[in-house]
A protein has these predicted regions:
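Conserved short loop/turn motifs at secondary-structure junctions
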Residues: 31, 111-113, 188-192, 273-282, ...
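Short, hydrophobic-biased segments on the C-terminal half of alpha helices
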Residues: 305-309, 514-515
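Short, positively charged loop/turn segments that connect secondary-structure elements
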Residues: 294-304, 316-331, 486, 500-512
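Phosphate-backbone binding and catalysis cores of DNA-processing enzymes
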Residues: 27, 48, 95-273, 379-433, ...
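Short acidic, hydrophobic short linear motifs in intrinsically disordered regions
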Residues: 268-271, 279-293, 320-329, 486-498
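Intrinsically disordered, low-complexity regulatory segments
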Residues: 2-169, 360, 460, 478
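Basic, low-complexity terminal or inter-domain segments flanking catalytic cores
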Residues: 2-34, 44-47, 52-54, 126, ...
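A short, conserved structural fragment
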Residues: 312-327, 520-529
Length: 799
């Protein structure tokens, strides 16, 4: 059932939720101009461009956010957020405030999107800067012209965009904070739900249900091989039988058709030749870049965005300093600036020739939901061709940069021109068609490799010279069996495409959505494909039953539209939040009532008898999947692995260390493990993270257990590669040193992504312990190895 938010905007003068206060900061006429950005890499690039009159500092991201342990939203007071300063970045805040007091003026140069606008607004609050003053500068590429132009034209912070980001943050907090405890009661403690992530999980679960319900249907195709008088052979495919579409359902029908075709030669009844133009695709948006990076480079969306961030913020190039190589990477626009069009057209003509330059620039249509606030993703300077940067960029950086470079150049090149030949053959009652393609002019495809052309099936075989009325001899005919296929499982590329098509999320949210549903164990990857877990199905079923409106695809897309309207000043924060809350609060109240009534009724009772107390055991769910538990808990705490009796014993490739037999997979209450069917030996499963080893680029990082029982993550090619880290790695890289990032769990159970390189300036430093007892502790013998994203520094692990 589609839920609608009804919002009437009557007042044209809308007051922002950002609020106002009296600002007292006094500028220091003798100080420098202070510019604040998010990252040290970006700061370094901009400071090189502007020179010694400017000081550029990094905020290291958000310095204020909603509190971790409370809701942090005053629902009764117009949904006012209650922000707190980041305790872990207290030193950053202190330093920025100190430098602000010494500065002549302050320019906030955070990213040119809603998230960046919100960071600038939070900085204005911390630094006592009036957000309505000309303090905000924005640019879409980090190049000298763009930076200098931005500095000359500062503007007030766009409070509408701040409100739009604030609305997204508060919506997600309300859903997560209210839904998660409800899920704990229904399934198990520790589960969490998200507004957009739940919809993405739903799409994957519903696709899996379609696949499971699908029943394949057999069909056959028939192909004949013919020879001309000049003894040249070609293939033709059966299209019609007795003037009707050919439908062959089984082997017997296929054999009958094959025999019929072989009885006589065929006459060529028509030959048509058609010239076709194939135009290049538009330059990359965030979505299309992520899709191509998955399909062509085998990069995950998180890794793609991390690499793109590095290319945008700047790379040290000998003789040129720190250079931003691409435009801003979070965009839904395919637009190219007039200045870059003036540069790329002469470049194409000079490098590839006049024939490859179209008469006028190629212009691409806007997407229906495109905000068109930024340009497309493109190189910033055509001086830096990929082959010039091979010694400067890491392997993965270069691969992504080359992808962006080629896509941009191709988008402004002439189309490919080909000639398609279609010949129709008649053999008795059987009609066959032969097709061939000849490329007359390669156009933009001159940039594509042979491998890429094969991936896209661009080249079809040529046909020999064929003439109407001529007879050709049949040398062979054969049938081929096929079965209709179910819809494919989602990959990262296809899920991102679907989310974009359905209006769910925006360029900045695709990668976090995919990362979140995997971290929460709602879906897993088999190869490149997403497969929902038991817990993913369970949570999705519950949310669809009790929160049909909130996890509706249409409702989620509608909310995105309202967030856009807030950013454009066409709706207010308060009204959108109220419209959402009216829907959500009703569903939450109903869910609490109904779920309490039906919880016991919904319990799945098994046929397995508890050997300790004689009760029928019930099927329960944990983060590791289904298991059997005694209903008389806590008086009886018996649990067992869950088996339906329908599972086939899954044999692994792992040999038992004791007897050499092939081990089989078993499911325990704490997850899957290996068991020898002969001698009973148990063994833990080595878990592949799917993340490419950043040191050797050949193996994957896998989860292992050290001799002392501690888990760590090392290269699957060990001992050939000794890359290892203690904490769980993610497909994201440090913007300062390029090392892989890892998840660090703090004492308050909160996760934080940190650089794994202890020598990096962003790596959290341990406080010095002065106690005598601490100094006497034995030092670890764990070997430490180093490897960055391009074979640089990494912290070792594994003893």
């Amino acid at each position: 059932m589609a839920i609608q938010i009804t919002i009437t905007v009557k007042d044209k003068k809308k007051k922002s939720s950002a609020g106002e206060k009296l600002f007292t900061r006094k500028p220091n006429a003798k100080g420098k101009h202070l510019i604040i950005v998010e990252s040290p890499a970006k700061a370094k690039t901009i400071e090189r461009i502007l020179g010694s009159d400017y000081k550029v500092l990094a905020s290291m991201g958000h310095l204020r956010d909603l509190p971790q342990r409370t809701l942090g939203v005053d629902v009764e007071n117009d949904f006012k957020p209650e922000y707190v300063n980041s305790a872990e970045r207290a030193d950053v805040i202190e330093n920025l405030q100190k430098e602000a007091n010494k500065s002549k003026d302050i320019l906030l140069a955070t990213d040119p999107d809603r998230e960046g606008e919100a960071i600038s607004w939070h900085l204005s609050k911390l630094l006592d800067v009036d957000p309505r003053s000309n303090t905000r500068i924005a640019f879409h590429e980090i190049t000298p012209p763009a930076i200098k132009e931005a500095v000359l034209h500062p503007e007030p912070i766009d409070l509408n965009r701040v409100d739009a980001q604030q609305a997204r943050r508060v919506l997600d907090r309300l859903v997560g904070y209210k839904l998660s405890p409800w899920l704990w009661k229904q399934v198990y403690r520790g589960l969490s739900a998200g507004r957009v992530q739940s919809v993405a999980t739903r799409l994957i679960c519903e696709r899996e249900e379609e696949i499971r319900a699908f029943k394949p249907v057999e069909y056959w195709t028939v192909e004949g091989i013919y020879r001309t008088e000049e003894k040249e052979s070609f293939k033709a495919k059966l299209t019609q039988v007795d003037g009707k579409e050919a439908k062959i359902n089984n082997a017997e029908e296929a054999d009958r058709v094959v025999r019929g075709i072989l009885k006589q030669p065929a006459e060529i009844t028509s030959v048509t030749k058609t010239k076709k133009q194939r135009k290049a695709k538009p330059p990359y948006t965030t979505s299309t870049m992520q899709q191509d990076a998955v399909n062509r480079l085998n990069f995950g969306s998180k890794k793609t965005m991390a690499l793109a961030q590095m290319l945008y913020e700047g790379i040290e190039i000998p003789g040129h300093g720190h250079v931003g190589l691409i435009t801003y990477m979070r965009t839904d626009s395919t637009r190219i600036s007039d200045e870059m069009i003036k540069q790329v057209r002469p470049y194409i003509e000079r490098v590839y020739g006049k024939d490859y330059l179209p008469p006028k620039p190629n212009v691409y249509a806007r997407g229906k939901d495109s905000q068109d606030a930024h340009e497309a993703i493109r190189p910033t300077n055509l001086q830096f061709a990929p082959d010039m940067l091979a010694a400067v960029l890491s392997r993965d950086q270069l691969r992504l940069y080359t992808l962006i470079w080629n896509r941009f150049l191709a988008s402004q090149m002439a189309p490919q021109i080909s000639q398609a030949t279609n010949a129709v053959l008649q053999s008795g009652i059987y009609t066959l068609r032969a097709t061939g393609t000849q490329v007359l002019f390669d156009g933009f495809t001159v940039l594509r490799t042979v491998k890429e052309k094969k991936q896209d099936n661009e080249e079809l075989p040529l046909l020999p010279a064929l003439h109407k009325g001529h007879t050709v001899l049949n040398t062979k005919a054969e049938g081929e069996q096929h079965f209709t296929a179910p819809p494919p499982r989602y990959t990262e590329a296809s899920l991102i495409k679907t989310l974009e098509e359905k209006g769910i999320g925006r360029p900045s949210t695709y990668a976090p959505i995919l990362d979140t549903i995997q971290r929460r164990k709602y879906v897993e990857k088999e190869g490149k494909q997403f497969v929902p877990t038991d817990i993913g199905f369970k949570v999705t079923d519950l949310l669809k039953k009790y929160f049909a409106g909130i996890v509706s695809v249409d409702f989620t897309a509608q909310l995105e539209t309202w967030l856009d309207k807030i950013a454009d000043g066409k709706a207010t924060y308060k009204k959108v939040m109220s419209g959402f809350w009216d829907v959500f609060e009703k569903e939450l109240q109903n869910a609490n009532l109904e779920a309490a009534k039906t919880k016991e009724e919904n319990q799945e009772v098994s046929d397995v008898i508890c050997e300790k107390c004689g009760a029928h055991m019930i099927v329960k769910m944990s983060r590791y999947g289904k298991y059997l538990a005694c209903p008389n808990f806590p008086s009886c705490k018996n649990i067992k692995p869950y088996h339906t009796g329908e599972e086939k014993e899954e044999i692994s490739d792992v040999d038992c260390d004791k007897c050499g037999a092939k081990m089989v997979y078993r499911q325990g209450p704490y997850g899957r493990y290996l068991k020898c069917p002969e001698c009973g030996q148990n063994k833990a499963i080595v878990i592949d993270t799917g993340i490419e080893c950043p040191k050797c680029h050949e193996g994957h990082l896998v989860k292992r257990r050290s001799k002392r029982g501690r888990y760590f993550y090392g290269c699957s090619r060990y001992p050939a590669c000794d890359m290892a880290v203690w904490d769980e790695p993610v497909n994201e890289f440090c913007s300062v040193c390029g090392a892989i990032k890892v998840k660090k769990v703090r004492k308050n159970k909160e996760e934080e992504l940190i650089c794994s390189n202890p020598e990096c300036t962003t790596h959290p430093k341990k406080k010095t312990v002065t106690k005598t007892s601490a100094a006497k502790k034995k030092t670890t013998t764990a070997k430490k190895t180093t490897a960055g994203a391009a074979g640089k520094t990494k912290t070792g692990a594994g003893d």
